[in-house]
């Protein structure tokens, strides 16, 4: 089992690394050339800046049982199909039971933005420490669940 992070502008990278280190799990951070990262713990893979390049690379190296951290519903759907686990930076788990609904909502929101001529209907609120704690707790639970299933 490894942890793969869609690390372009991901606010929970340090939390992922800290928790993964506690469990001795390898972490791979994926970013494009516009968001070059460095890490003392994680492997960093930098891909070209093409549209969705990081997403495609992440999907290609993901395996059954891996844990993926991404805010992209499309990536989540693809890795779930490969038997991996996926979690949003909010701590929400993507599952086979909720991903279809999430993709439909994304589609409807995109249609609404097009119809209104707006690029975004609303911005996300500023991240607070409670958000980080919620992510950490949810991520920890996912790791334990994945480890139990590996046994």
Residue ranges and their predicted role:
Residues 2-151:
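Nuclease catalytic cores that cleave nucleic-acid phosphodiester bonds
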């Amino acid at each position: 089992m490894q942890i793969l992070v869609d690390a372009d502008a991901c606010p929970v990278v340090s939390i992922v690394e800290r928790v993964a280190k506690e469990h001795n799990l390898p972490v791979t951070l994926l970013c494009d050339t516009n968001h070059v990262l460095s890490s003392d713990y994680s492997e960093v893979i930098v891909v070209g800046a093409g549209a969705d390049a990081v997403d495609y690379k992440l999907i290609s190296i993901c395996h059954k049982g891996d844990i993926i951290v991404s805010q992209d519903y499309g990536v989540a759907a693809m890795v779930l199909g490969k038997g991996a686990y996926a979690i949003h930076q909010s701590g929400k788990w993507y599952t086979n039971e909720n991903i279809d609904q999430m993709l439909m909502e994304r589609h409807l929101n995109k249609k609404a933005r097009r119809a209104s001529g707006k690029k975004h209907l609303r911005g996300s609120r500023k991240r607070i420490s409670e958000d980080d704690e919620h992510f950490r707790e949810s991520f920890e639970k996912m790791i334990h669940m994945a480890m139990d299933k590996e046994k």
